[in-house]
Amino acid sequence: MNSHQPFDTSVPINNRPAVRRTCAAFSVAICALLSACGIAPGQHMADPPALPVTTSDNGDVTSDMKVPVKQIDLALVNQIRAEQKSVTAAPVPADLFGRSSGYKLGPGDVLQITVWNHPEFAAAAGQPMQNTRSADAAPGFVIESDGSVQFPYITRPIRAAGKTPSQVQQEIEAELKKVFVKPQVTVRVASFRAGQVYVDGEVRAPGSQTINDIPMTLVEAVNRAGGFAPTADQSRVTITRNGTAYPVNVAQLMKSGVNPATIMLQPGDLLHVAAREDNPVFVMGEVNKPASVPPQRDGTLTLSEALSEAGQLNQQTSDAKQVFVLRKQADNVPVIYHLDLKSPVSMLLANQFPLASKDVVYVDNTGLVRASRVLNLLIPAISAGLTGALVTK
């Protein structure tokens, strides 16, 4: 005996609940597929790319600006490298260079003044104190705030600020000759307290550095601060003097054969070393590890180096023909550079193409990947609809 129920032809097929549910599920799927471009997850480079300028209240773009796309070739690489070199190789002001003419005394310095064969002057200099602090002045003659120093048997203050110890020695000897026969005087600095420079940023030991008889050059200041930290961007060093900031590209100076030790610092100068993380390049899209990539220690970064830091292109989802570099130029006008990395030879261009601060490197996905992602969104809805239709059949 046949256990199946006979097919009821009295009810039109399109009025049966199970059929209606199944059709509804397929209708939803078809509508979603028709709008696949709008619901596809992830990003995709439009053709042609455009930047929204104005939008309406409901979010629709009312006007846009077409962004030019330039193909990366050897001529373009050479052009960009020349432009960047002209910027990074900007001359350092001549005022920063110089030679040391010897230490010049200043207010706060402590002098040790010895008059030979006259021990009575030793008491005037004072005796060392026990349990002294590092900030305490050493025993001796302190140069006053007006730049003068007092010494026994000399009726007038000796002008010391702006002079070398040997010049002060000669002046004291000349005055003491009025009282003693052929006095022999020695003047040395017991404590350097007149001037400091300040080093901050990406050095191992930021802080103030006292200027002494060793010329305070840029290199000396960095070395006293423990040297550049691994995070330092040696292309972005700034000297601030009297309210004016002077950028110094230390890496470029060395490449050009200019010794940074010829840059002389003055009392009150601020030396700041920028961090590499302050000027990153953003790598996103179909790469294995999307990341914010800092430049190298010399401030440079190429396209191939950035992709390498991001784990290279994702071989399953990336379209190697669609690698883009998005950049905002000096006039705030955006530009997009395109490189086809399908051929390994194009890696030579990527290895030479220089990136700039805040560039965005974007690797597009393939059309199949976009379709697959849309289907992955729709399959759960379709399956649920079909299951519901079968259950209620």
Q: Residue spans of the language-model regions?
A:
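Positively charged
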Residues: 70-72, 80-83, 179-180, 229-269, ...
